[in-house]
Amino acid sequence: MTKFKLKIVTPSGIYQEVEVNQLNLRTTAGQVGILAHHMPLASGIEISEMSYIIDKQRHIFAIGGGFIYVNDDETKIIANSIESKEEIDLNRAKEAKRRAEQRIKEVTEKTDLLRAEIA
């Protein structure tokens, strides 16, 4: 299977430059599979799982949104954040989830209080 260039950039700099056989990710238009010689594409990327295949080996990542640009045999991803499954710190992720849930609860409580005051 023919390969194409994939370049992933984050706010911290170049994350990876690799030659891949296939790229799979979720864009704002839905799930997309990219192969060599794909038609030109520019789209937003959803916060989701992303994977690529190199010589039948699948590499999995968590991507924190961004943009993808495809032109012939070169694909560029500008990601807000990205981590391979090996890089994800499960304890840190659980703590971040707990903090986010707490913030949502606080916003809901404040919203309910404001609604009560207005009524």
Each model region followed by its residue ranges:
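N-terminal export/targeting signal detector
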Residues: 1-5
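Compact, glycine-rich, soluble single-domain proteins
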Residues: 7-99
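Charge/polar-rich, low-complexity and marginally structured segments
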Residues: 92-119
